[in-house]
Amino acid sequence: VHKIIFLDVDGTLNCSKTWQGPHEDGFATLCPDMCDRLKRIVDETNATVVLSSTWRLFPGKGIDKLRVWLAERDITIHSQTKDLSMEISWGNVRACRGDEIAMWLDDHASEFPPLEREFVILDDDSDMLPSQKPNFVHTSFKDGLTDAHAAKAIRILNDES
């Protein structure tokens, strides 16, 4: 079974405490404890990390900084979701994070077949599709990725009810 983590950054790997103060490049420092929790999820599930955060939209800044921080923990970003925010609009309804994740899963179905995969979404925003709710771990900007969130993600990825 292939296991996938859709990773948001702000509100997952950093929080209101690490966001305080000036940030030279506009990107907050990641919280070491939260990065360690992500590492625990990866280690206990052998999951692949896919970046769904808006950090993916800033090559040379956000994503490069993130890759360095995660590499220090032997975590690699496998891929990233496509930004649909400017591409798809149905009337007044904009594409949401859940749409971007659904498109990634569809686009990568040969590599990660639907019947042979488990996925989890780590995000402090709740704009997921109804079908994704069982796979959604709702973090918060106040606290980021907690031990309880990590445990829930591991249960989802390891298909433990």
Where are these predicted regions, by residue range?
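Active-site neighborhood of HAD-like aspartate-dependent phosphohydrolases
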Residues: 1-46
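Structural motif
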Residues: 4, 48, 118-120
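Short His-Asn-centered micro-motif
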Residues: 7, 52-58, 122-124
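Short, active-site-adjacent cap segments at secondary-structure transitions
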Residues: 13-14, 57-59, 127-129
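Acidic-and-aromatic substrate-binding clefts and catalytic sites of carbohydrate-active enzymes
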Residues: 28-29, 57-61, 90
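Substrate-recognition element of Asp-dependent hydrolases with the DxDx(T/V) motif
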Residues: 42-63
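C-terminal cap/substrate-recognition subdomain and adjoining C-terminal extension
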Residues: 63-161
